Amino acid sequence: MSLGLVGRKVGMTRIFTAEGDSIPVTVLDVSDNRVTQIKTVETDGYTAVQVAFGSRRASRVTKPLAGHLAKAGVEAGEILKEFRIDAAKAAELSNGAVVGADLFEVGQKVDVQGVSIGKGYAGTIKRYNFSSGRATHGNSRSHNVPGSIGMAQDPGRVFPGKRMTGHMGDVTVTVQNLEIARIDAERKLLLVKGAIPGAKGGKVFVTPAVKTKGAK
């Protein structure tokens, strides 16, 4: 249960260490994370912080949501995201507060969640890294087929979960234990070592890693 940030994937680049080593990084824009609501055990049954990210035209905001945001005194955002946190951390925040890149520190491990790039309808070779059939030696019209998908009369069906052709990508993916290589507090950017899911401009959620010893 840790507070995180909503961000936008700007793209990838590289940075250099003092020793001259090249490090591939993904640039995330985490500006304007605004607190819209603080939930407590007394009022909601659990403790959490709701933040808004981005901007949205007033004509595109429903009346209930507009009232909710007006109560907090916060501009409408493109995304509303809720983070479960403990009561002590929630007490340090207030409606309208801005959570910035200084929430994290260089070298910290984080988990980044996003929606992967859609690949459309794909075969088993592309989707699951199956091997193709032989190109010659009697093989005809069976070069890229997946092979048998079932059995005989018993059990007489295809087992659920069988890896077959189908839609690839466009699913929620979480990459764990990525390292924050650099923080640009002035431009409100996080530079995360390695690649993260999604295309340029995609929305991501950055939270402290949960499976690393000493994660903050």
From Swiss-Prot:
Biased composition (Polar residues): 133-145
UniProt KW RNA-binding keyword: yes
Source superkingdom: Bacteria
Leader sequence segment: none
Gene3D superfamilies documented for this protein: 3.30.160.810, Translation factors
Pfam families linked: Ribosomal_L3
Keyword Iron annotated: no
Posttranslational modification: Methylated by PrmB.
Region (Disordered): 133-153
Annotated keywords: Methylation, Ribonucleoprotein, Ribosomal protein, RNA-binding, rRNA-binding
InterPro entries (UniProt xref): Ribosomal_uL3, Ribosomal_uL3_bac/org-type, Ribosomal_uL3_CS, Transl_B-barrel_sf
Positions of post-translational N5-methylglutamine modification: Q153
SUPFAM superfamilies per the UniProt record, alphabetical: Translation proteins
A GO CC term assigned to this protein in UniProt: cytosolic large ribosomal subunit
GO biological process, alphabetically ordered: translation
Molecular functions per Gene Ontology: rRNA binding; structural constituent of ribosome
Complexes and interactors: Part of the 50S ribosomal subunit. Forms a cluster with proteins L14 and L19.
Reported function: One of the primary rRNA binding proteins, it binds directly near the 3'-end of the 23S rRNA, where it nucleates assembly of the 50S subunit.
Family stated for the protein in its record: Belongs to the universal ribosomal protein uL3 family.
Protein known as: Large ribosomal subunit protein uL3
Organism: Burkholderia orbicola (strain MC0-3)
Gene: rplC
